[in-house]
């Protein structure tokens, strides 16, 4: 499994453990490029999660889509093996925060 695949495996396990609805859009010729690896919904809030390994960063197109999603009110996270705790932070913010 690739390093990014391991990050995705951990994200998937976290989403399932918290019973959060999600899907993983597939980048096909009929899909849209730049969309995060995961689209989730928690208490009516849209969450995009981009998985990266190590110090890898989103592409310019991914960053543009992330900005568009944030402008529409979504949460967008870029998660790697070092910041998986951000998932818990977003859960707390959506459940208890001022959103």
PLM feature spans:
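Catalytic phosphate/metal-binding cores of nucleic-acid and nucleotide-processing enzymes, i.e., regions
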Residues: 1-99
């Amino acid at each position: 499994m690739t390093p990014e695949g391991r990050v995705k495996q951990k994200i998937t396990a976290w989403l399932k453990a918290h019973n959060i609805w999600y899907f993983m859009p597939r980048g096909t010729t009929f899909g849209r490029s730049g969309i995060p690896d995961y689209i989730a919904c928690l208490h009516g809030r849209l969450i995009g999660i981009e998985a990266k390994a190590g110090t890898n960063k989103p592409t310019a197109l991914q960053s543009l889509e992330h900005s568009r999603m944030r402008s529409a009110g979504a949460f967008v996270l870029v998660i790697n093996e070092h910041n998986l705790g951000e998932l818990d932070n977003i859960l707390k913010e959506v459940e208890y925060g001022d959103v």
